[in-house]
């Protein structure tokens, strides 16, 4: 399959640069994956689509204020985006500057917030392909504390504006728990505490995985044939209680509903690893990196329904949705969303999709 198969025209004005005032006020396009039927709703209506005994899988990662601005020892400007925390004081990062810093180079970050000559000193330890390993010079200073002081929320490039104070709350799910992501699991942004309480009262079950979303999620697919694409690695935790909840839900004849593509990739990674180990369970605990790439023709072992935002043209995420709902149904749904002026991407509207049991490639 070609990357261009997943292209669609998107008017710039449909890219949401700010969230709706209320989380549940977003629109919801419901797609029946089996027959392609489309229904237009609001996100609050999802309460009627999720039933007693169904299991919602949430990603409880917390977005860290991962973007820092500063200068090199030479005085040149530098921008640093944390990709992965390695220890309290070391991390991997993307670095933007006129010249890439060399091993041993000093960076002074956060002067935009702390004042000139009051930045936090970082040392460039090593380079790993496109990523730089940096260390805080003051060993007793923890990275997460530094980021709270000087970091900016890492809004996606297509939002195309500086971060604002409100983004600290709105570019974060209400159930976030484990710090480490540099991009939000955006399907979860539509849930507020009241909706979660209503779902609980209805008898809907919750389970929480952790996938720390990396900046690689915004990288374009640079090959012509999608099968040649190599996914970036992200760290995943699928604990025993999640596996138990999934198995119990399946045994009861209820649905496993993934909130977001990161939840899909988490549980499907765990199920695939279980199968590859030859174990006789559907899914077993998983604490490791995943580079799983789900595109049309791939098998879903766990997930029955998917809640997700609208994704970029030619992205790995629209490929995942096409694998789940069927290519033709997915592209028709996206065309309908554009025609009906849905809002796209991280701060945009959502879809509720049931799995197409008949998909295989470009159906």
From Swiss-Prot:
Its main location: cytoplasm. The keyword Cytoplasm applies. GO terms for biological process: queuosine biosynthetic process; tRNA wobble guanine modification. One of its GO terms (molecular function) is S-adenosylmethionine:tRNA ribosyltransferase-isomerase activity. Keywords: Cytoplasm, Queuosine biosynthesis, S-adenosyl-L-methionine, Transferase. It is found in: Cytoplasm. GO terms for cellular component: cytoplasm. Belongs to the QueA family. Transfers and isomerizes the ribose moiety from AdoMet to the 7-aminomethyl group of 7-deazaguanine (preQ1-tRNA) to give epoxyqueuosine (oQ-tRNA). This is S-adenosylmethionine:tRNA ribosyltransferase-isomerase. The gene is queA.
């Amino acid at each position: 399959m070609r990357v261009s198969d997943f292209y669609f025209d998107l008017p710039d004005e449909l890219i949401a640069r700010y969230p709706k005032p209320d989380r549940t006020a977003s629109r919801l396009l419901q797609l029946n994956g089996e027959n392609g039927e489309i229904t237009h709703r609001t996100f609050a209506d999802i309460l009627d689509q999720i039933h007693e005994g169904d299991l919602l899988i949430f990603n409880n990662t917390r977005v860290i204020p991962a973007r820092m601005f500063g200068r090199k020892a030479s005085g040149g400007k530098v921008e640093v985006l944390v990709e992965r925390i390695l220890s309290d004081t070391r991390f991997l990062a993307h670095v933007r500057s006129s010249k890439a810093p060399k091993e041993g180079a000093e960076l002074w970050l956060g002067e935009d917030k702390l004042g000139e000559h009051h930045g936090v000193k970082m040392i460039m330890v090593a380079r790993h392909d496109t990523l730089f390993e940096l260390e805080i010079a003051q060993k007793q200073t923890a990275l997460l504390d530094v980021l709270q002081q000087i970091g900016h929320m890492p809004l996606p490039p297509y939002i195309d504006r500086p971060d604002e104070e409100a983004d600290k709350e709105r570019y974060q799910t209400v159930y976030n728990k484990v710090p480490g992501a540099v991009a939000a699991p955006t399907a979860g942004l539509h849930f507020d505490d009241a909706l979660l309480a209503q779902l609980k009262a209805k008898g809907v079950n919750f389970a929480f995985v952790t996938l720390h979303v990396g900046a690689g999620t915004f990288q374009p697919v640079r090959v012509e044939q999608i099968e040649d694409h190599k996914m970036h690695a992200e760290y995943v935790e699928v604990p025993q209680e999640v596996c138990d909840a999934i198995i119990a839900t399946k045994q009861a004849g209820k649905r496993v509903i993934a909130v977001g593509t990161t939840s899909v990739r988490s549980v499907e990674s765990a199920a695939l690893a279980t199968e590859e180990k030859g174990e006789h369970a559907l899914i077993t605990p998983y604490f490791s990196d995943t580079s799983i790439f789900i595109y049309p023709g791939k098998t879903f072992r766990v997930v029955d329904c998917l809640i997700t935002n609208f994704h970029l043209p030619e992205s790995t995420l629209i490929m995942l949705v096409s694998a789940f709902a069927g290519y033709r149904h997915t592209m028709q749904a996206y065309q309908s969303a554009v025609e009906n002026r849905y809002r796209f991407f991280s701060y945009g509207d959502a879809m509720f999709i049931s799995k197409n049991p008949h998909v295989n490639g470009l159906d």
